[in-house]
Amino acid sequence: MARRTEFTVLVGTDGSPSARAAIAAAAMFPWPRNARVHAVVARQEAGAGAPRKRSGVTNQPDERIVTRTRRALARRWPDAEVTLVDKPPAEAILDAARRLGAAAVCVGWRGHGGFRRLLMGSVSREVVRHAACPVLVVRRRPRHLRAFLVGVDGSLNARRAVTFLSRLHPPTGGRTTIVRVVEPVGLQSAGLLPGGIRGTLRREVAALNAERIAKAERDVEKAASQLRRAGWRVRTSVRSGEPLTELLATAAETKAHVLVVGARGARGLSRVLLGSVAEGSLTHSPVPVLVAR
């Protein structure tokens, strides 16, 4: 188990382009100054019990992946550890995260075992769903990792996302945008009601929506204060609409390099491992997604 004073980052890799992008992102990410990294390479394909054989790369030994991974990470961490294990990838990553007491896990969006027609690899999905710490999922190699967008909704996981960002070391030029999306309350079948009642209900609904927006503004300012104290430049935004749609639109408008979401929102069921906004972000976001819990 890692010492509590350390911030351990675990990187899972299988040598795929997506995994190499995750390694590059891990080396660029603004982790705390005391961060250490450990990478794990699994010998087995996801769901297989025999040593891995990958289409098109059967002559690439696992030891070469270990060497390349260590070399890439050594640019930031000269003492980076890379472990080769005989386990399916998701199991290897989750086991290592528990053993090391990882503060964060970094994985590629889809590895060698995935099919091109699948939206997201089974390994990254399983890691995101079952890891006890935040998971950074990387689709392609980023050029910069300075602009963050964090979606908040009042949930415990959203607050944990803000706290996680406050632990990072803000990079030069680093900025964070905090966005809260309020789904407006509307009237259904109001046209069937008498005019006087319809007008009263509309005023009440308008007042309710205004109250919810005011609360959202207070919530984002509270989160912004926490990040400003940690050294981040912060902007806030409260939007009205469907949460995932507005979150992705804000990410595009702000040119975010990283999208940060809670694993499950305020309305998520406790038995659900991953909420709809987190799932949608992982599926549709072109930039790395950090799922916090």
Predicted feature residues:
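Phosphate/nucleotide-donor binding subsite
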Residues: 67-79
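Well-ordered alpha-helical segments embedded in enzymatic catalytic cores
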Residues: 22-25, 92, 161, 219, ...
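A short, acidic, amphipathic alpha-helical segment used as a generic capping/interface helix at domain edges
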Residues: 221-225, 243-252
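Short, surface-exposed alpha-helical segments at coil->helix boundaries
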Residues: 55, 59-70, 213-221
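Small/aliphatic-rich secondary-structure junction motif
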Residues: 2-59, 76-80, 143-203, 226-230, ...
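Charged docking surfaces used in two-component/phosphorelay signaling
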Residues: 84-92, 238-246
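Gly/Ser-rich helix-loop-strand patches that form or flank binding pockets
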Residues: 1-7, 23, 28-32, 94-143, ...
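Structural signature of PLP-dependent enzymes
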Residues: 205-212
